[in-house]
């Protein structure tokens, strides 16, 4: 019985005002994506396991929701939309359709450990720019993220930008084995630089590389830190990565969004498919990034086609939590009109409701129970966020109540 009445851990029901606010927020963001010329795409909720296998670079297999179809194929609830978009780009889109701007809204499913207390099903809205490797494409993505968050109502937020190529150059210069590199990535991602120094010493990494990796803690801030990054760049690849960030920043000034941009050269990415710039968006009221994105120039190739690409995803649920904690209201405009009627006025009430609905007015219809007062229905209307209440009485009068101002008036109904 317990499992019959409760949802599994990590999923939840969303209804009434919260659901209306979530849909309104999603629609706002969707509109911004369309303003930038992005076209909608829908992908399946589940895919073959191969789409999210380890070699793709997405989340670990143990965090996937896996099941079998009747033929014995292993299927997976999507944990991430990007590999699906890559599959579509490689298999369905023709050469004449690139560069392609695609956007989506959908739920993703990740089997987080129970102790993390995180949602296992979340709603994402995102955009993917396929077929173009350029500073302009990178800058457009970042500008689009900023415009989306501003449209959501946020005023204080920050987009941290890094470059995987810079970080990877340091790893290559360290000459460590795969296991040590994975551990280093974890330590740096968690800002545990003491643990990193200890591990580098144990691995007998040369002093110059240790110093460069230790300097990552200082390579966080405004555009000025890029000069420092160029001084410790261990290779031409790393230097090119920093210069790319400088060029992107110049374009972002033209978009008038550079004030929201900071740099973090220690970013290495949660997913293994990132290849160039990587970015995350942060604001008050949520512990994790509300936006994650970056360039994945080699991902589509794993599905059989070479294609540079960049994209991002906004986690709607986390964004809503941040807005709520910052006391930023999400107007949704879903104000119903509540019509109640005495039993003898049913036909009139139905006709009036039909007239309202024909004019795109949300209308709820209830027959008044004899043992319930009008005040009961007024309270009900306020709880359901109705804007007004009309009471059709057997006396041929209509009592009108403005549930927002408390104003009342009586009119004679039409014959």
Give the positions of each predicted feature.
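Phosphate/dinucleotide-binding and metal-coordinating scaffold of catalytic cores
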Residues: 97-98
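Short secondary-structure transition/capping segments
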Residues: 4, 52-56, 170, 376-378, ...
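Short, surface-exposed recognition loops or helix-turn segments adjacent to catalytic cores
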Residues: 156-165, 184, 262-266
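Short, conserved phosphate-binding/catalytic loop or strand-edge motifs used
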Residues: 120-125, 161-169
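Acidic, His- and aromatic-enriched active-site or binding-groove loops in soluble protein domains
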Residues: 63-69, 176-197, 257
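TRNA-binding/sensing appendages of the translation machinery
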Residues: 1-83, 139, 160
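Charged, compositionally biased N-terminal leader segments and the immediate start
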Residues: 1-6, 171, 176-183
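Positively charged, Gly/Ser-enriched RNA/tRNA-binding surfaces
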Residues: 24-32, 48, 82-93, 102-132, ...
